Each structure stands twice: as C-alpha cells, then as structure tokens.
Amino acid sequence: MSLQSSIYRIIKFIIFLTINISIYANAKDIANLQITSNTLIIDRIKQKAEYSGNVIVYFDNAILRTQKLYIFYKTIGEKQVIDHIVVPSKLTVERKINNELLLADSAKYFFVDKQLILLGNVILQRNDHVLKTNKLIYYVEIVRK
C-alpha cells in the first residue's frame, strides 16, 4: 500500500507550509485531498511531519479541523510508509452527507492494526442520533495476523 493510499484510508474515516499553504495529493484515488495549515515541519530524523496552526483537512465531502496533526512514518526497504497519525488537540469532523459530526479531545490512528482511537469527550452525531463516550476504539478493517 502506498503512502498516499494510506493517507486516503484514515482521512476517509475520520472524516489533514507556512501561511496557509495547501498540499494536494496527486494519486487518482485521493485527488480530492487537501491539507492546509499555518505551518508544516518535516523532521526526517524523527520521520515525522507536523502540521500546526489552523489545520484543516478537506476530503471526500468531509472537513477535519484541529490545531495540530502529526504523521509518523517509517522506511521499509526504500519506501516510506505511514506508521501512525496523531491528532493531539481537539478535533472536529463535519460531513454534510447524513448531517454527521464528530468531536474529540484527541485521536490516534495505527496503520498496522487499522485502529482508530478517539479520546476525551467523544461525541458522534448523525442527524438526531448522538453517541457520547470518553474513549472510542474503531477498527477500520479486521486485520488477521
């Protein structure tokens, strides 16, 4: 799985350089992805991309808003792949389809397990249906090991 398709999968569910710079993905399956932030810092030694300040991710009829988003990657052979994504600050995801809203204090997504963990004041709302909890673990796919 390529790095770009990995980004596509996480942003699809939870639905990510300086002075409102936009990054557009160029793969055909994630052509709609756009991430804006005030700052992007890429640390090749720590293998981390850090988006900060008014981070907005537009994707697949969804908008994710937060103040910080970290993408941690690793090198396998000669390819760089995403290991996990961390949203350490409050996040909001809005989807116009089905009038969906997601709120949480923080989130983590682990690619190996295909596991999304939402932490702190988690609220999922779809039309008139609301789910509130302090922690929600969601498996995007069942991984057989």
Curated annotation (Swiss-Prot):
UniProt protein name: Uncharacterized protein RP507
InterPro entries: OstA-like_N (IPR005653)
